[in-house]
Amino acid sequence: AQIDLNITPAKYEKIFGELSSHQCEIIDDKQSKYIVVAAGPGSGKTRVLVHKLASLLLLEDVKHEQLLMLTFSRAAATEFKKRLIDLVGNVAHYVEIKTFHSYSFDLIGKQGSLEEAKEVVQHAAEMIEKREVEPSKIAKSVLVIDEAQDMGQDDFRLVQALMRQNEEMRVIAV
């Protein structure tokens, strides 16, 4: 299978070589519309997500603008970006990896303040539901959610709204 790939054997090894067979199954899965990875702390969920993003970009020909990753902290977003750069290089700079709040502020088209932060995710979800967001801003083929178990009602509503607008969107939740 490696012969057909548009990446070097060394890059292929970097993406798949350090992973367990279960982790490789997740990264190799090109069919499932929904993937949920449930595992304990320290089990490699973050690694799986980063390697899955690398696989999407390099092996499945998903374009960077088709990817959206949502997380709960800027620190997590920064760490993901750093790890992705290590695997795929400069293309990682163009992958949208944001917190739920920063993504929501982007969608509603304004800078965020602490007072507004409480309601911004709900407001963004409402705007998507009412089709008040430019479709190109939310057209994604893959949504990756870090720490999905921490989603509150508003976060989940935002994810549902995105899924309704992108019926073919694959969702990977950890």
Segments from the language model and where they lie:
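P-loop NTPase Walker
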Residues: A1-S113, Q153
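The start of beta-strands in P-loop NTPase/AAA+ ATPase cores
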Residues: K33, Y94, K140-V142, V171
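Conserved helicase motor core of SF1/SF2 NTP-dependent helicases
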Residues: P41-T46, H51, R74, V142, ...
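Conserved catalytic network of the ASCE P-loop NTPase/AAA+ motor domain
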Residues: E60-V62, P135-K137, R164-E167
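Glycine-rich loops and low-complexity Gly/Arg-rich segments
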Residues: K63, H93-E96, V120-A124, E167-R170
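Short C-terminal domain-edge/linker segments immediately following a structured domain
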Residues: T99-S102, E126-K130, V174
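Conserved RecA-like ASCE ATPase "motif II neighborhood" in helicase/translocase motors
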Residues: I108-K140, E147, M151-A161
